[in-house]
Each structure stands twice: as structure tokens, then as C-alpha cells.
Regions:
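A structural motif
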Residues: 2-385
Length: 385
């Protein structure tokens, strides 16, 4: 299945948008470079309960937010700055079935007497376009040890069936630290797991349609996998783990592809190409050299259950591909679209049920391309918001 795309760009003419120069000034560096010191944020384009899309871009000391004016677009508001002093330009983003959006990040505040004070922070948006609840500190798994606290990884957050947040982060000792909410919303003390292997990469959590939390973390010469079968259960080491070899840092993503099943995707550190894996199968190569993580979306295309992928290609442009879900042997074709971008592209369905591919341009501005009203996965011209 070969998606088609138009590479031209149109500018949104929505009233109330910031002037071009102001927009660029506010949105500059909206996403970290794919080869920057932090992994690229994924899953940053979400559809709310009212059908409107929202895009989130972590920047130093805050988050930029764009919101559709009406379901299906094409006009947007933003970028609006959601201040968070000390926040690093990385987020883990999770959405509940009710449309609540949870943002989790790392905050660093310089101290004159030694290492910076580092903590994880959490905020919630309950309705599309509405203000965030205040950022709440979740502390640090190393407590008051600021030297170790500075060396934690980036967080990965998911929601269980009750809507409670489960947070995972690699700690400074090479183990896993974990924190979760109870069903009442109260945060529990830090816990985690200490494998025989030394964890070296970022935690990547996902949940099955049955609510099982499934966690992968790269380690020295291995990939470690844990499962949490129930919201209040302990993390248990999984029986099956991918023989992945070298995973490029910050590239693990996942999509629900069947009852109780997740398909994991990552980029190989050896050749930069995409791999897919499910328990019971070896990793499968999907081609697509490039950088950063792969955006994922499972949706019907012409009546066929398909998994759509998008990533930043070797020339810096967004690339899109699709194949029948869980049929990696069918192959896929990567199609470039638009102009060079920064960070990782994102995929979502809009209020009209169309596939939307979004990316940040090299000035940090938001660009979107929507599926055409015709058979297949052809995209209309890009629009700069």
C-alpha cells in the first residue's frame, strides 16, 4: 500500500492567528532536533472528546499548544504558551477515554550549592482548549540525592483501565523506577524493579486493550520487558522479550494491533531502519531509514484494517507508509511528504475520521496534511497553522 502526498503548502487564513514573525518567535524550537540531547516527543497530536485535535510541543520552560477551532478543521488557534519554569523540552503524553490529557515531564531548577534539583512533574487538561491544572511535582526516585537525581532518564506514562497514571523512568543506578496513582488519584510511593541487566535506554510503556501495562527498556545487549497485569499488581518480568540487538535511543513506540496484543516498533541503531515485533515472532524489518521514533495509527483504509506509520526520513522530510495490520510480510512503501521537519511527526484521526499527518517545520511552526476524500491514503496539501 503506497500512500500518496502533495508536497505543496498552504497557510491557514484563520482569524486571530498570531502574525507570522510573532508565531515563529514563540514557536521556535517547538520540538527537539531528532539528533538532539533529548529524545523526540511522540504522540503529541490528540483528538479530544469534542472531536477537536490538539497539538502539544514541549519547549524549555513550558509547552506550546495549538487547538482546532472546530472538529475537522481547517482553522486552529495558537500557539498558546503553557508555562512550566524549568521544564525540559520533552513530554510523555497520555489520553484517557474521557478525553483527559496527561502530560508528564522532567523539571530542572539550578541550585547555587551544587547539582540542579530535578523532579518529575505532571499536569492534566480535562477539556480541549481549557487551561491545564497546575503542574504537580512527583519527586525523584533518588529523593534528596541531587547528583543521582540529575541522571534519571525521560519518563514514560500510560493510563490503566481506571484512568490512573502509571509512570516509569530509568534511574541513575541502571534500574527501573515506577510510580502510579491509586484509583482515587492519589500518587503511591516510588517503587520499581532491579534487573540483572543494566538499563541504558528510555522506558517505553504501553497498554493493551485489556488494560495490561507492557513495558520495554533497552539494556546492555538486551531489551528488558515487564508486565503489570492489573492496576495494583507488581511488575513481573515477561517470559518473551525481543532479540532486538541495538535499538536507536528514544525510538521505541507501540500500537494495539489485536485483542490483548501490541506491536512494538523501533529504529535499529545499526542501519537506522524500522523494526516491528510481537511476542512469538522475531523482529521484522520494515525499511524506512531515518531518525527518531515512528508515529503510529491503526485505522481502516478502504475497508481494510491497516497500521499507518510516519517518521522523519533521511532527508529530514516526513515519510508515511501503511500495511495490513499484523501482516508485515505484505511489505510497505515509504512516501515522502512536505518539507523538512524537526522532531517526530504525529498521526491522528480528525473529527471527520480523516487521517491527519502533522509535523513541526524547521522554524518550529505546526503543519498539517489531511487525508483526501477519495479512496486510498492520499494526503491533501500541507497547511501551515
Amino acid at each position: 500500500m503506497a500512500p500518496r502526498s502533495q508536497g505543496t503548502s498552504k497557510r491557514s487564513d484563520s482569524a486571530g492567528d498570531a502574525p507570522d514573525t510573532a508565531r515563529k518567535a514563540r514557536a521556535r524550537n517547538a520540538a527537539p532536533p531528532a539528533n538532539g540531547p533529548l529524545p523526540a516527543t511522540t504522540g503529541w497530536l490528540l483528538r479530544g472528546k469534542d472531536g477537536r485535535l490538539t497539538a502539544y510541543a514541549p519547549v524549555a520552560d513550558g509547552v506550546l499548544r495549538w487547538t482546532e477551532r472546530r472538529p475537522g478543521g481547517p482553522d486552529w488557534t495558537g500557539p498558546e504558551t503553557l508555562a512550566a519554569p524549568g521544564l525540559l523540552p520533552y513530554l510523555s503524553v497520555a489520553r484517557s477515554p474521557e478525553g483527559y490529557v496527561h502530560l508528564v515531564g522532567v523539571r530542572k531548577r539550578p541550585r547555587a550549592d551544587g547539582p540542579a534539583e530535578t523532579d518529575l512533574v505532571h499536569a492534566v487538561q480535562f477539556q480541549t482548549g481549557r487551561p491545564l491544572r497546575d503542574w504537580a511535582s512527583l519527586g525523584n526516585p533518588h529523593g534528596k540525592d541531587r547528583e543521582k537525581g540529575e541522571r534519571i532518564g525521560m519518563p514514560s506514562a500510560v493510563l490503566d483501565r481506571t484512568g490512573s497514571v502509571h509512570l516509569f523512568v530509568r534511574n541513575a543506578n541502571g534500574g527501573l523506577s515506577a510510580k502510579n496513582q491509586s484509583t482515587t488519584g492519589r500518587w503511591q510511593p516510588w517503587g520499581g524493579a532491579t534487573p540483572e541487566e543494566t538499563l541504558t535506554g528510555e522506558a517505553a510503556a504501553a497498554t493493551t486493550d485489556g488494560g495490561v501495562v507492557d513495558l520495554l527498556v533497552p539494556a546492555d545487549g538486551a531489551v528488558v520487558r515487564w508486565l503489570r497485569e492489573k492496576p495494583d499488581a507488581r511488575l513481573e518480568r515477561a517470559d518473551e522479550e525481543p532479540t532486538a540487538g541495538d535499538i536507536a535511543p528514544g525510538t521505541l513506540t507501540a500500537e494495539r494491533t489485536g485483542p490483548g496484543r501490541l506491536t512494538r516498533f523501533w529504529r535499529a541503531g545499526t542501519d537506522g531502519k524500522v523494526r516491528a515485533w510481537r511476542p512469538g515472532t522475531p523482529p521484522t524489518g520494515l525499511g524506512g531509514p531515518g531518525s527518531g521514533p515512528v508515529a503510529l495509527l491503526r485505522t481502516p483504509v478502504d475497508g481494510h484494517d491497516c497500521t499507518i506509520l510516519a517518521h522523519r526520513g533521511p532527508d529530514g522530510r516526513p515519510y508515511i507508509a501503511a500495511y495490513p495490520t499484523e501482516d508485515e510480510a505484505a511489505g510497505l512503501h515509504w512516501t515522502p511528504s512536505g518539507t523538512p521537519c524537526t522532531g517526530a511527526p504525529a498521526l491522528a484521526l480528525d473529527g471527520a475520521g480523516r487521517v491527519v499527518l502533522a509535523a513541526f517545520d524547521e522554524d518550529g511552526g505546526l503543519r498539517v496534511a489531511r487525508q483526501k476524500e477519495e479512496p486510498g491514503l492520499a494526503l491533501a496539501a500541507w497547511r501551515t497553522v
